[in-house]
Amino acid sequence: MQYRRFGRTNLKIPVLSLGGMRFQKSWDQLDFSEVSYEEQNKVENILDLATQYGLSHVETAKYYGTSEVQLGMCFKNTKKIPNIIQTKIPPNSDPEIFERDVLSSIEKLKVKKIDLLAIHGINTAEHLHPVSYTHLRAHETCHN
């Protein structure tokens, strides 16, 4: 697998990543108990195969339905956790809501930290300004 430096950081990121948009039973935010064995097994098999191929970066998002919770169960039940876990949350000008979204993703993914956090859906200049302020708190939340 080829790697590149991620922006101005020292993080080496693979040129291919595993997208988790279709890792969901539903686009709705459902509890894991509503996910069937077959649906979860599909995600586990894909994650296992991706790991065998050297894909060490997986991404998901709050708005990908049950994707975060299903990936979280995979991470809980296996030792094959990708080196880089990324999720996306919506922009929010309220730092408490922003932080709550970050912590919710960490909880659903059953990890101690998120390696990469993306802001999903910055569609206007108004969305960007609050993000520049609140991302500092998210950084502290993700890395402490």
Question: What spans do the regions from the language model cover?
Answer:
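Active-site groove signature of glycoside hydrolases
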Residues: L109-A125
